[in-house]
Amino acid sequence: RGSSVFVLSERGATSSQARLLAQRENEADLVGGVNLGAKDLFLARTLLDLSQTATINDSLKLGKYLLGELGSINTLHKNNVEQASFAVLKAPDIPSALIETAFISNPDEERRLNDDAYQEKLAIAIVRGVRQYFSKHPPSPKNRLAALA
């Protein structure tokens, strides 16, 4: 019951729920590889690892803002950002988060998710969380085009 926010983990899932959800999501999606265009495989892997670590830290910050906003309109499943190895969260240069807004297996939450006003509250909470993150952590010059999108 409640909302959850997940970000990528380098060390595995923070809970059994996170691990199971990541396995299910990863089996459902095919993910293309990252082409760094480097001839030195070791260098390419090192650069990717460094970038991924920085992105995970940024994603954790983003997740905290999202949880703060979601917690103002919904019960939180957990008060902290969870981590798991979701294939869809592996972009090495863009903070990303997977948001579970509720559990449709819970009749009360399913009813709320079908309510237009509640959907709007969820959307506004997510937008606020993203805006808070970017207002405090603006993109570096190399990523300014992403901020315009």
Where are these regions (language model features)?
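Active-site-proximal helix/loop segments of hydrolytic enzymes
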Residues: R1-A149
